[in-house]
């Protein structure tokens, strides 16, 4: 074997030792030297855990009688919630394939064909603007089953989620809390409330029914309601001045709120 044209000091041998966390290096630089970035133990651990989670998903759904069936990637455009990514066809000039936003139609075909339980670890593509909960391509656990009720889905997804988190050494408390859509909207104003946030909306319409405050009057007369958040023991922090200036003019608009 040939010798290296330079000497490697023992001090430079850092196998298995992470010299700096991801925050210590600019993301652009990490991506430029991705092959070095992926040598870090923490990065490799992400890939290893993902592999084990996906394997756990496959094993669990196989135990429950689900078949993993791949669906086409180059397909016809179908109505979905975003724009399609289009791929020009070489064989048919002027025509395009569409990358799937989801395998919705294909899995419905499988159901009516007699495959009663299907799943797929599938790549999806959506041409939409980047947001915290949106990206152009993503992988999802896609499944479908025939002749079941909602209780079947509740129990299936709870058990699957518990097993997935267990791969990372996280034990989730059971049973999972359940909340109706109406309860979520009434108490949190969202159909996906963050349960870590303990403050819930409190109905205050009756308190303000005879108020002279024009905005509240207009809302109540139109059949709307007035709700608030009861923040106890924070009067010295959330003063009227802070609420009217810092929160109403800066924080609320930055989060998409119209006013406060």
Could you tell me what each predicted segment is?
Residues 1-260:
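Class II aminoacyl-tRNA synthetase catalytic cores and aaRS-like
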